[in-house]
């Protein structure tokens, strides 16, 4: 009986990791269509996606009049873009950045003020947790390019990316305590995964302004880019990402899937996932070409 329950639990966890599967449904008290109707009432800004032929996507937060704060419409569009990326089989990498040299200042306060009941807060939390968890599980190697400020929900969004690049003048700040709340888009859990529980508690309770040097020191940032304008920084980010996404898309996507399963699944299930991914690659075009080109004993 116990083995049966464990196998069932593992199966559920594995299914959750599958691309395109929502984190919540009505059994969790989550009514997605109702939340969407509420968010539609708060227009403004856009989430723009460019899918390049080299397999790198560019996701732009565009609401520059409000430091790229998330309006309700932008939250809806972010989910739409995630679904689009889930179906982009040629994709290998993704860069997330904000328009006009600012990453994101969090949620638009107009929406926050209107959604002031605990019920609305929890519904919004579940919507964004679902979106950003699906984002995190995309079979794409993702990079947050932080220019200017990444605050509140913007700081949480950076943690959903695999890597974070910062320009010298940029700042990441989790301001939730000063707003009388806690991170609710999954940011606290992901921050613990990235920098450890002790550092995460300091960052969240201290509401520190993490400049690029401090973020690099504690392991939140992966590299600091030289001073540059928006276009040049984006070019630098693409060059940085290219070192990790060179090669066949199927292989890069398989690597990301393997890392996701290793992070989120029990060991036995993660090992099974490794074998499942390997089965799609072993003896495939990339594998056979590499063997023929390099030979078994060459370096």
Curated annotation (Swiss-Prot):
Its main location: cytoplasm. InterPro entries: ClpP/crotonase-like_dom_sf, Enoyl-CoA_hyd/isom_CS, Enoyl-CoA_hydra/iso. Pfam families: ECH_1. SUPFAM superfamilies: ClpP/crotonase (SSF52096). Keywords: Acetylation, Cytoplasm, Lyase. It is found in: Cytoplasm, Cytosol. The keyword Acetylation applies. GO terms for cellular component: cytosol. It catalyses: (2S)-ethylmalonyl-CoA + H(+) = butanoyl-CoA + CO2; (S)-methylmalonyl-CoA + H(+) = propanoyl-CoA + CO2; (2R)-ethylmalonyl-CoA + H(+) = butanoyl-CoA + CO2. It comes from the Eukaryota. GO terms for biological process: fatty acid beta-oxidation. GO terms for molecular function: carboxy-lyase activity; methyl/ethyl malonyl-CoA decarboxylase activity. The modification N6-acetyllysine is found at residue 209. Signal peptide: none annotated. The modification N6-succinyllysine is found at residues 209, 293. PANTHER family: ENOYL-COA HYDRATASE-RELATED (PTHR11941), ETHYLMALONYL-COA DECARBOXYLASE (PTHR11941:SF27). Decarboxylates ethylmalonyl-CoA, a potentially toxic metabolite, to form butyryl-CoA, suggesting it might be involved in metabolite proofreading. Acts preferentially on (S)-ethylmalonyl-CoA but also has some activity on the (R)-isomer. Also has methylmalonyl-CoA decarboxylase activity at lower level. Belongs to the enoyl-CoA hydratase/isomerase family. This is Ethylmalonyl-CoA decarboxylase. It comes from Rattus norvegicus (Rat). The gene is Echdc1.
